[in-house]
Swiss-Prot record:
The lineage of its organism: Bacteria, Pseudomonadati, Chlamydiota, Chlamydiia, Chlamydiales. Binds 1 zinc ion per subunit. A motif ('KMSKS' region) lies at residues 270-274. Zn(2+) binds at C28, C213, H238, E242. It comes from the Bacteria. It is an enzyme of class 6 (ligase). The keyword rRNA-binding does not apply. This is Cysteine--tRNA ligase.
Length: 477
């Protein structure tokens, strides 16, 4: 099935036609001057959804996510704390990886640290100077001349003639009102940088933030990428500058598809550390919410729409996951009779799966996919309540254990995309299921001694049996 993605560069949905196999995917990672907030994780979960959908559709993916461990903010933090850059950043790096695991975000294939690629960055800057697209300013910093790159502004759709063009800027972050030549190598300032610098042919200093991503992506993925993803904040100046640098170095198109997620809001305002209205994942875990609940909240809205964060939204996510958990537990009930997978159940599953996938291939429309999931759950619950399969006029077959297992297999399949379904137990080995069936048979003929023996045998294999009013359940110890 064809996948269509909204390309920021063209401002259109385009059929995804990768140039590379595996697909080369680069995503903007954290700047490790502090703990990542959940606004950041909205972007990372969007990128995780993108990757999961690609894998689900059969693509191989090589994924690189950078770690920015040298920039204005990390230097300021290390200077304030009076420690090395590495010592300052390391706790935030460890916390970031722990957060990824808590939120069930798949690991990237590589996590390059900017500080590990300084020699390659220096070499690239020298190449840009030799080409005449970069120059050394009066402050001894090296700048990229945007006037030497004719396509500058294409990604962010800037009309350069209508914008005020300053001479140059050495800050890592700035807005469109300060359009200017941007820094490639920031000259060393002892009052600002302390003892943190690298030697180069241009003098002591450190690389600019924009150059870092260009060099790390080119070093690990080559000169032309299939997809570059990040937050909408990164379109200008960061990604615009990446294009200018990278294409000046390679003389090839840098990225085929640019994807950007929109802001997470708090009280209808953008969540950001500068505004002081942010929450870290740890804040929410301390309030009693789970990683799955946070993931579901951040996952459920379309990535190109703003998502408003509220406590009510988190509680709604909790209820949605409870509904999913109750449904899964119901299917895992082993008391259903043995029978075939009824055609009506198989048809309902296939219809749901087709709707689920079709929505995802339409620019990752997860909202529509989740709506289809809950509609499917409603239909199956209704049929179980009636002790039948999916009813037709000619067939009212009893809902079977095989029906339940078929649906559970389908849910495990779609969880390859969602990464959030709360399965209450792992797959039960066939030999344990056989012992469970033998025990049920012994109980039916009131052979309690044999039933107890089989219970002990099941326990010895790491599973427990719970007998209740609604039937018997098997759980892993």
């Amino acid at each position: 099935m064809d996948l269509f993605l909204y390309n920021t560069l063209s401002r259109e949905k385009e059929r995804f036609l990768p140039v590379n196999d595996p697909v080369k995917l680069y995503t903007c990672g954290p700047t490790v001057y502090d703990y990542a907030h959940i606004g950041n994780f909205r972007t990372y979960i969007f990128e995780d959804l993108l990757k999961r959908v690609l894998l689900f559709l059969g693509y191989s993916v090589y994924h690189v996510m950078n770690i920015t461990d040298v920039d204005d903010k990390t230097l300021a933090g290390a200077r304030k704390k009076g420690c090395s850059l590495e010592k300052y950043c390391q706790p935030y790096i460890h916390a970031f990886f722990a957060d990824l695991e808590t939120l069930h975000i798949l690991k990237a294939d590589a996590y390059p640290h900017a500080t590990h690629y300084i020699p390659q960055m220096i070499e690239a800057i020298q190449q840009l100077i030799n080409q005449g697209v970069a120059y050394i300013g009066q402050d001894q910093s090296v700048y990229f001349s945007i006037s030497q790159f004719p396509n500058y502004g294409a990604l962010s759709h800037l009309n350069l003639e209508e914008l005020r063009n300053s001479a140059r800027i050495d800050a890592d972050e700035y807005d469109k009102d300060n359009l200017c030549d941007f820094v490639l190598w920031k000259a060393y300032d002892p009052d600002r940088d302390g003892e943190i610098f690298w030697e180069s042919p241009f003098g002591k200093g450190r690389p600019g933030w924009h150059l870092e991503c260009s060099i790390m992506s080119i070093s690990l993925l080559g000169q032309s990428l299939d997809i570059h993803a990040g937050g909408v904040d990164n379109i200008f100046p960061h990604h615009e500058n990446e294009i200018a640098q990278s294409e000046s170095l390679s003389h090839k198109p840098f990225v085929r598809y640019w994807l950007h997620s929109h802001h997470l809001l708090v009280d209808r305002k953008k969540m950001s550390k500068s505004l002081g209205n942010f929450f870290t994942l740890r804040d929410l875990l301390d309030q009693g919410f789970s990683g799955e609940e946070v993931r579901y909240l951040l996952l459920q809205g379309h990535y190109r729409t703003q998502l408003n964060f509220t406590q009510e939204g988190l509680h709604a996510s909790r209820q949605s996951l409870k509904r999913l958990r109750d449904f899964i537990c119901r299917l895992e009930d082993p008391s259903y009779p043995d029978d075939i997978i009824h055609p009506e159940v198989a048809t309902a599953c296939q219809s749901f799966l087709e709707t689920f996938i079709t929505s995802l291939t339409n620019d990752l429309n997860i909202s529509s996919s989740l709506a289809a999931l809950f509609d499917f759950i409603r239909k199956i619950n209704s049929s179980i309540d009636q002790h039948t399969g999916i009813q037709t006029e000619t067939d009212s077959s009893v809902f079977s254990k095989q029906d339940a297992q078929h649906i559970l297999a389908l849910l495990r399949k779609i969880d390859q995309v969602l990464g959030v379904l709360p399965f209450s137990q792992p797959d039960i080995p066939e030999e344990v299921l056989l012992l469970v069936e033998q025990r049920e048979a012994a109980r039916k003929v009131k052979n309690w001694q044999e039933a107890d023996r089989l219970r002990d045998e099941i326990l010895s294999r790491g599973f427990a049996i719970e007998d209740g009013k609604t039937g018997m359940k098997v759980k892993k110890l």
